[in-house]
Amino acid sequence: MSATDIYNAVQAAFDGDPGPAEPPPLEISGSGRGDSTIPVYADKLLNRSALRDLPDPESLIDNVLDHGTVALLYGKWGTGKSFIAQDIAASVATGRHWQGRDTRQRRVLYIAAEGAYGLKGRLHAWETGWHTPIRDGQLDVLPQPVNLTRPLDAANLGALIGWAGYGLVVIDTLARCMVGADENSAKDCGLIVDTLHRLRQQTPDGRGVILGVHHAGKDGKTFRGSTTFEAGADTVYSVAAEERVIILERQKRKDGPVVDRHELKLESIEGTSSCVIEVSQLTSETTVRAVTGPREVVHGERESFIGEYSWQ
């Protein structure tokens, strides 16, 4: 099946029969607005009043993730990108601040395409460390990949998102969910990005967030594969490890300031087999310490165990 065939099939699965691949020749009658035939896109038009009434952009996590967007988080293996994605997911699911930023509580779906067994220990450490339980129905885990190149799989995932009302969907990793696609093909990657946006449309009022976790290229700094991914996403963050510090930095934001840099670290949690993500240094560009309530401690009280865990 060609990339064009995949696109048409995905479109049909989401929206019904998309019609012919090529539009019929455009016929201009010369009658202008007096023509009784209503054009296909007429009901999609926004006049000035309708445009003025559109909701203002809002954040899922203040100055990090915006409602109604597709976001990408990428980094080299072992930089802690999955820990960050899981920290974001748990924070949104419970409504807890994420690294000091206000968070809107939403139901979360985490697609653990590489398996869910590691999540058990990590989420236990998160709950223990932040004294915040994740209750049933707040964060659901799908412990298998969903092949986004297969129209039926993509449509079934969209149906699940709409049925459950997930406001955040994390796909970890994209590579495991696009088997058969060529990461270096602009056409293939464009179709995957289009599918991510279609999945976002299935979230409540289309205002949820789809967060895809991906790998960095051979240089460890740039997004692996076609630049179509980054071009088609609304928000892009990179993750890098510098000695004992995890650097999370925004590379793209469709609306609003781009600059957002976090210096983070992994800290072990006593009584668990894993750790949590915390601020490493308090600088003008990083957020305030995320620890609040019963677990508020002096910065640096506990020993950091970066390097002793599998912290992809």
Where are these regions (language model features)?
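Hydrophobic positions on the alpha1 helix immediately C-terminal to the Walker A/P-loop
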Residues: I84, I88
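Conserved beta-strand position immediately N-terminal to the Walker
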Residues: V70-A71, V108
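Conserved inter-motif catalytic segment of the P-loop NTP-binding fold
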Residues: P39, S49, P55, L60-I61, ...
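Conserved RecA-like P-loop NTPase ATPase core
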Residues: L65, Y110, D172, A233, ...
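C-terminal regions of RecA-like/P-loop NTPase motor modules
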Residues: Q11, A21-P25, G30, D35-P39, ...
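Core recognition of P-loop NTPase motor domains used across DNA-transaction enzymes
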Residues: S2-H67, T79, G129-D136, L142-P143
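Phosphate-binding/switch region of NTP-binding enzymes
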Residues: L72-L73, G78, S82-F83, L168, ...
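Post-Walker A helix-loop "phosphate-sensing" segment adjacent to the P-loop in P-loop NTPases
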Residues: S91-Q105
